[in-house]
Structures are given as structure tokens and as C-alpha cells.
């Protein structure tokens, strides 16, 4: 049986307590437990972001946040991109990124998006129109590159 796809995008203050709990739970599951990356997840940036996520029976299976201009970079940025173990290999990551790009271009009327992407996902982000704009650097002991999209490709 396939995944029941229910996409939502909300500002921090619009999230229900249950939605916020599920988002924080899956972020800890993926970034802290799976990637053994001990870091301060609650960084105040969530309050200045749109939260795009996919739910399946109340469980968050894919998530990212779209940060306002000036929060992390001069441009709008996308971060905390993840799919849960149960959501992987179903195309949710690509669909989610396409939805995020479309939202930024059409609703926020911004043309540039910056990300700090894990190096192993560089080809994936390039396929969406992002270009590498930095050398490789370590963020929480994981190789990353900064990438910028000035005319992202997106398909829903």
C-alpha cells in the first residue's frame, strides 16, 4: 500500500502542538539518532520560517523549513531537509523540494534560494537548479557545500 500524502505549509505560529511535536521528533530521529549529529536543533530560526511537511496518518514523513531572508543568509534559504525512514525511496524529497521552490517563487516572489546541503546530495540539488558556490566545509562533522539557485527548476 502506498503512502497517504498530505502536504502542509505553515508558519511557526500556525503549527499545532501535535504538528510541532512530530516535526521535532522526526528531526531528532533523522539528524541526531541516524546521523549521530549532536547539535542544538532548537535554534530560534523556526520562529522565522515556513514549515513544509508531509504527513501520513499523523506521522511526519518529509520535512523542511523555509527561512526568511536575513535569518541565515541574505537570501531566503531552505534547511533541515529530511525524509523519515518510512518516507524514503518514494520521491517525497524531490516533490517536497519542488513544492518549496514553487512556494518561494510564486508566493514569496523571491528568485534566489540558498541552501547548505550535505555533500552527498549535491547532484540531487543540482538537478533542481542549484549551483555550488562554496568549497566543501564541515558542519557538525558532516561535509557540506553552500548552493544557490537563481532560476530553480521545479515540477509538481
What are these regions (language model features)?
Residues 84-85, 116-118:
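Residue-level recognition of the GNAT/N-acetyltransferase active site
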Residues 42-47, 70, 138-139:
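A short beta-turn/loop motif at secondary-structure boundaries
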Residues 2-51, 55-60, 156:
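Short amphipathic alpha-helix that is part of the acyltransferase structural core
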Residues 97, 104-117:
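Conserved GNAT acetyl-CoA-binding A-motif
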Residues 69-78, 88, 107-111, 141-143:
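A conserved beta-turn-beta hairpin within the catalytic core of GNAT-like acetyltransferases
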Residues 114, 126, 131-146:
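Conserved catalytic-core motifs of GNAT/GCN5-like acyltransferases
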Residues 53, 59-69, 75-82:
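Conserved beta-strand in the GNAT
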Residues 83, 89-102:
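Conserved acetyl-CoA-binding loop-helix of GNAT-fold acetyltransferases
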Amino acid at each position: 500500500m502506498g503512502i497517504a500524502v498530505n502536504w502542509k505549509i505553515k508558519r511557526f505560529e500556525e503549527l499545532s502542538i501535535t504538528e510541532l511535536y512530530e516535526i521535532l521528533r522526526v528531526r531528532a530521529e533523522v539528524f541526531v539518532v541516524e546521523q549521530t549529529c549532536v547539535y542544538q536543533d532548537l535554534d530560534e530560526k523556526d520562529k522565522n520560517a515556513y514549515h513544509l511537511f508531509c504527513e501520513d496518518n499523523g506521522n511526519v514523513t518529509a520535512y523542511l523549513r523555509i527561512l526568511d531572508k536575513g535569518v541565515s543568509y541574505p537570501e531566503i534559504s531552505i534547511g533541515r531537509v529530511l525524509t523519515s525512514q518510512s518516507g524514503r525511496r518514494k520521491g517525497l524529497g524531490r516533490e517536497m523540494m519542488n513544492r518549496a521552490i514553487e512556494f518561494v517563487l510564486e508566493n514569496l516572489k523571491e528568485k534566489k534560494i540558498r541552501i547548505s546541503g550535505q555533500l552527498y546530495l549535491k547532484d540531487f540539488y543540482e538537478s533542481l537548479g542549484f549551483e555550488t558556490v562554496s568549497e566543501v566545509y564541515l558542519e557538525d562533522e558532516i561535509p557540506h557545500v553552500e548552493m544557490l539557485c537563481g532560476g530553480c527548476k521545479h515540477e509538481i
